[in-house]
Amino acid sequence: MPAIMTMLADHAARQLLDFSQKLDINLLDNVVNCLYHGEGAQQRMAQEVLTHLKEHPDAWTRVDTILEFSQNMNTKYYGLQILENVIKTRWKILPRNQCEGIKKYVVGLIIKTSSDPTCVEKEKVYIGKLNMILVQILKQEWPKHWPTFISDIVGASRTSESLCQNNMVILKLLSEEVFDFSSGQITQVKSKHLKDSMCNEFSQIFQLCQFVMENSQNAPLVHATLETLLRFLNWIPLGYIFETKLISTLIYKFLNVPMFRNVSLKCLTEIAGVSVSQYEEQFVTLFTLTMMQLKQMLPLNTNIRLAYSNGKDDEQNFIQNLSLFLCTFLKEHDQLIEKRLNLRETLMEALHYMLLVSEVEETEIFKICLEYWNHLAAELYRESPFSTSASPLLSGSQHFDVPPRRQLYLPMLFKVRLLMVSRMAKPEEVLVVENDQGEVVREFMKDTDSINLYKNMRETLVYLTHLDYVDTERIMTEKLHNQVNGTEWSWKNLNTLCWAIGSISGAMHEEDEKRFLVTVIKDLLGLCEQKRGKDNKAIIASNIMYIVGQYPRFLRAHWKFLKTVVNKLFEFMHETHDGVQDMACDTFIKIAQKCRRHFVQVQVGEVMPFIDEILNNINTIICDLQPQQVHTFYEAVGYMIGAQTDQTVQEHLIEKYMLLPNQVWDSIIQQATKNVDILKDPETVKQLGSILKTNVRACKAVGHPFVIQLGRIYLDMLNVYKCLSENISAAIQANGEMVTKQPLIRSMRTVKRETLKLISGWVSRSNDPQMVAENFVPPLLDAVLIDYQRNVPAAREPEVLSTMAIIVNKLGGHITAEIPQIFDAVFECTLNMINKDFEEYPEHRTNFFLLLQAVNSHCFPAFLAIPPTQFKLVLDSIIWAFKHTMRNVADTGLQILFTLLQNVAQEEAAAQSFYQTYFCDILQHIFSVVTDTSHTAGLTMHASILAYMFNLVEEGKISTSLNPGNPVNNQIFLQEYVANLLKSAFPHLQDAQVKLFVTGLFSLNQDIPAFKEHLRDFLVQIKEFAGEDTSDLFLEEREIALRQADEEKHKRQMSVPGIFNPHEIPEEMCD
């Protein structure tokens, strides 16, 4: 069967690609059908045939036949793809008469298809694609080869309403292509010319839009015109907006017509966002007229929340657009309206609408409103941060030190506070949630959207609290009271209230905070006793834990309360409801970090530090926790121990702290000494992994002083490492590499990994590099390096590489002497694992380059000490890195290269031979990634490296000849070398283009943003064949701009004494 398929495909391909005979349209339709409706091999064959045909340089000559005779819409779309391809890439090399022919054909086809209203509706997608083709032609032809385009399209629009409607779409697409999407699609100079042409000829387009809006009764045409106008508003000269009847037409004629209200409101929003001072009156008019219309369309007493939930799509869109309009206008022009006393009421009405819209149960709309409330609260606070925040309404007498703007917004801010408290989003720390089925469960996936919403709401509520903390407290206390008495009790209400209470930590005066919090925690603890049922208790517990975790200042100041809270957390650690134990451990660690010192001091009324109580009862506290929760608990206690400053006391605490894990560890080591096979027992290996994880977390918290515990287990741990390595190797030899997937082998590898994590974690926190280098590094290298080298690739631990990287980063010069030994063991064998492709061993890949980066940054002399063959491998691997498809690896590769180049420049002895051997090579490889579209993300770094390299040559830092065979001035050589390199890679470029590009590489090498845009322009040019006519590349203009840039650079340099060699200074300046 596959053989027959191949024959058929070959036959189809031969027939379709034979341009000497007529196109068999039925055959083409069949192949296209195969692509869309076939499966497997059949589909792949069709894809191959169509790709071959599309890439054929003469394929475009078949497009008219395809569009005219094909019965299949997909085939027509395929024909348009061919046409688009030729316009974008080969237009400049087509003879003029053929360009004119294609242009006439496309215009004719659009006129024919769009003149018939029924056809327009039926073939919407097809016409849309034809329009896009025309716009691609315009980007090549207009204004030079088609100066009359704007008057042509405006003239044609007056002949037929249906045609006019489609022409509006074409103008809208052209505007988008030139003003919104031009970056990276057309060169900067060409983009500027197209923008200038659009602005210069806009009056004709504007008159057409005005004519339609004033005279047409054709609703779809008017709608299309408004949509097009919307796209123009962000770039047209402002006179067209503010010195014509446009604003009043939009408001009076279209805003209250259901079909046009959404697009009209979007237009008004776009205008509202303009920031200029000379049109103040027009903005006031815009605001007052829009508000008048709004009150007719949507009376102020409307329940917008209800209207939204019952509304149709376009009604819901209208409410969203309304929020955008109000938010945009008020953020930009609120002070303009505030100044006018006669508009105060209108301003309050606008804020009332904002409040009503803020209550709509739709997150996207709420985010828009929140943006405004945040802006307003922040502005009012920043104007006078230290004004009293007591509420004048509550304190009975008028406070004259409340700033006037604040007074104006006061009544509204009461309502906004209530809104924020009632709608507070879920913070990241809360793990116990109610799911869609109404069950209380542990949340596993973090919702970044919800976290961002929480952060913005938190910030807004903090500002609102600063503006009037009495009111904030009143709202929260009342709402809490209603939870306790049951009138507002629900999980959702309790959650949002507690999340809001937690979010204002630090925004009240300390005394007020204390009074408020004591009430809150007492009420919540009471609620916990009062409510029955595990779910209720879990929700209340999660809220108590969240709030206490947010108020470390309060806890630090009130020891009794802190102790009560921590004991309550220990209670929750026995509560097996989903998520409660996790949250108890997470809250405990937060409190431990923020209040660490209080646990190691003897507090008033206590006989010993609380840490001793914890360590005495540690067994009882953690007996119901899961292993990973125990690890979190150990980390928390570690922060407390880390705060003890008396070394002797601290060492005693560490011994007591690690007693439980050490007992199990010692027992396993003793058994292993008698019978090493115990290290093949699954349960034992699992225990070892868990003990080491505990040590890792403890070390992370205690820091350098953990050395006393590390030293105690260090050599045994490395022996276990070696022993497990041998077990793994033996298993692989006996059963092949698949054995690494088995649970026991995976547990053994966990032990190895955790060993490396413990060592690297401690080294990164240590403070005595010499002691580490002398006592800890030698046994480590002995245990891990040879093992890594000997292992089969699948069994090599990527952590070995990251551990070495951490050691190099931390110890710097202290470890330089060991680098050759480390490299011998890990460099080549890892490189052979990752240089076959870009996918396998992703962790080894990342860590390998992190190690290279560490050596490059901290032990660069070691690079110069390794043999030349190995250094070449290092450089090859850096080049391999920046060509990577994995973004993080490519970025690391570029950073290593840049640092390497800068380091080499400091090494006089090695620099010149390095440049002679590698400079041109590196340049060539950098250009290969610059011109590779899959690497555009790295363009800034490419620009920095290239600019640095060209600058080295220009400033004469490279004294050796880059071309020993024919020694000429390096700058002249480099200009020719790069020009030839680019010409051979892109033979379709004209000499003038290449010459100008190379000139820019020298002129702009001290202005990275300009250098980067210069590269981006070049990337646009290599996509298309330029032909003889390069006028629309505006090379002369670009040349003048580059010359100016060069002169500017020269002037800047002249102003720095000594920057130029005395022989480079012009004669008249020598005197």
UniProtKB/Swiss-Prot annotation:
Keywords: Acetylation, Cytoplasm, Host-virus interaction, mRNA transport, Nucleus, Phosphoprotein, Protein transport, Repeat, RNA-binding, Transport. It is found in: Cytoplasm; Nucleus, Nucleoplasm; Nucleus, Cajal body; Nucleus, Nucleolus. Residues 411-481 are annotated as: Interaction with RANBP3. Changing residue 583 to A: Enhances Ran binding activity. Changing residue 554 to A: Partially abolishes Ran binding activity and does not abolish nuclear export complex formation. Abolishes Ran binding activity and nuclear export complex formation. Abolishes Ran binding activity and nuclear export complex formation. Expressed in heart, brain, placenta, lung, liver, skeletal muscle, pancreas, spleen, thymus, prostate, testis, ovary, small intestine, colon and peripheral blood leukocytes. Not expressed in the kidney. Residues 327-450 are annotated as: Interaction with Ran and nuclear export complex formation. The modification N6-acetyllysine is found at residues 446, 693. It comes from the Eukaryota. HEAT repeats lie at residues 217-240, 241-277, 354-472, 515-553, 560-597, 602-639, 775-813, 885-916, 917-954, 1002-1039. The modification Phosphotyrosine is found at residue 454. Changing residue 191 to A: Does not abolish Rex-mediated mRNA export. Found in a U snRNA export complex with PHAX/RNUXA, NCBP1/CBP80, NCBP2/CBP20, RAN, XPO1 and m7G-capped RNA. Component of a nuclear export receptor complex composed of KPNB1, RAN, SNUPN and XPO1. Found in a trimeric export complex with SNUPN, RAN and XPO1. Found in a nuclear export complex with RANBP3 and RAN. Found in a 60S ribosomal subunit export complex with NMD3, RAN, XPO1. Interacts with DDX3X, NMD3, NUP42, NUP88, NUP214, RANBP3 and TERT. Interacts with NEMF (via its N-terminus). Interacts with the monomeric form of BIRC5/survivin deacetylated at 'Lys-129'. (Microbial infection) Interacts with HIV-1 Rev. Belongs to the exportin family. This is Exportin-1. The gene is XPO1.
